[in-house]
Amino acid sequence: RTLAAGDPVRLYLLSLAAVIIQQRTAVNLAAQQNLLSYAQDGYLDALGTLLSVTRLAESRAVTTIKFTLSQALATVYTIPAGTEVTNGVVTFATDHELNIEKGKLEGSVTASCTVAGTIGNDYLAGQVNTIVKPMTFVSKAENTTITTGGSEAESDESLAERIRLAPNGFSVAGPEKAYVYHAKSVSSSVLDVSVTSPTPGEVDVYVLLAGGELPSKETLEQIDAYLSD
């Protein structure tokens, strides 16, 4: 029997075909979520738990803040951890206590942005220079390095790559990909890692951040501490 374009039977069969196609598409998509190359969002997170890999949260931009005293003192001057310095847009808080030795006029300490994400990146040296709560004897505070290292939550692409690399991290013999995996596990801002060994017992790790940026001294120190732990 030939069905005309408007035949009710033909229209009914077409409606059934649409439902069947959608169901099979949904089944195929659900099956793909079990595969690392296709998994997304929560499904990818679930695959990561099989290898104890979790999605990296947002990271905070870091910098170094230099505090300058109005005069040299006869005693040690302490600047508490959490002291905030701002540029009117973002605020950085010192990571730990800073003790300026007696007779000295200045001291430096690392500081992290109070808001996670890329919002704290790319402020040049000297741009973060206003103390939120003025302190006795402190005449000036400013960042001495460009603010870098802030990133958003880890993307599916980055997480999938770390899951692929995770088995290399089980080794304690220091294979190349183990260094890559651990370096990328420090922060979601780490885009790429290159590892070389110029001489036996010596390993050089080169890091590139998201957006093609070079890591700051503070970020490199974080990675070095993580790899040395």
Identify what each model region corresponds to.
Residues 1-178, 182-185:
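N-terminal polar alpha-helical/low-complexity "assembly arms" that mediate subunit docking
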Residues 93-95, 171-229:
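Carbohydrate-recognition loop of C-type lectin domains
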